[in-house]
Amino acid sequence: MAVNNRVKITNDIELKDRLVAINRVTKVTKGGRTFSFSAIVVVGNEDGIIGWGLGKAGEVTAAIAKGVEAAKKNLTRVPVLKGTVPHEQSAKFGGAEVFIKPASTGTGVVAGGAMRAVLESVGVTDVLAKSKGSSNPHNLVKATILALGEMRDARMVAQNRGVSMEKVFRG
């Protein structure tokens, strides 16, 4: 069941941005080579809100700024319980497949590269994560946010089913 987890940006949300990857692109023309840059940026308030954006420009700083602006327009709310995720979840985007699993307090963020940036930006402090397939940062970021967006805590499940929280746990 698709649940709308979209968040509208307001001034009271303080977002921190993290650069996931930067790529230099070369365009060969008759007059020589023209360089441009693309940047994948993740923004989050470290309290359950996450967004990602891709910025492209002739300068690195301009590409990052465009990525941040794009990320602010693409925010999603994620349930974070006691510094970890509520349950196991896997997702696939393109050739990248990710698996996210809750961890006990003190474990830390056990994840690599692009997944680590996303999980830290959303405010998860203890989690086990594994990626399979492609290590392309674009697809890893999208797959990780897709997996996080599919997370449901007990309150959300009870609300969707129209039953009490006790009935969710007792069956």
UniProtKB/Swiss-Prot annotation:
InterPro entries: Ribosomal_Su5_D2-typ_SF, Ribosomal_uS5, Ribosomal_uS5_bac-type, Ribosomal_uS5_C, Ribosomal_uS5_N, Ribosomal_uS5_N_CS, Ribsml_uS5_D2-typ_fold_subgr. Signal peptide: none annotated. It comes from the Bacteria. Keywords: Ribonucleoprotein, Ribosomal protein, RNA-binding, rRNA-binding. GO terms for cellular component: small ribosomal subunit. GO terms for biological process: translation. Residues 15-78 form the S5 DRBM domain. GO terms for molecular function: rRNA binding; structural constituent of ribosome. SUPFAM superfamilies: dsRNA-binding domain-like (SSF54768), Ribosomal protein S5 domain 2-like (SSF54211). Belongs to the universal ribosomal protein uS5 family. With S4 and S12 plays an important role in translational accuracy. Located at the back of the 30S subunit body where it stabilizes the conformation of the head with respect to the body. Part of the 30S ribosomal subunit. Contacts proteins S4 and S8. The N-terminal domain interacts with the head of the 30S subunit; the C-terminal domain interacts with the body and contacts protein S4. The interaction surface between S4 and S5 is involved in control of translational fidelity. This is Small ribosomal subunit protein uS5. It comes from Phocaeicola vulgatus (strain ATCC 8482 / DSM 1447 / JCM 5826 / CCUG 4940 / NBRC 14291 / NCTC 11154) (Bacteroides vulgatus). The lineage of its organism: Bacteria, Pseudomonadati, Bacteroidota, Bacteroidia, Bacteroidales. The gene is rpsE.
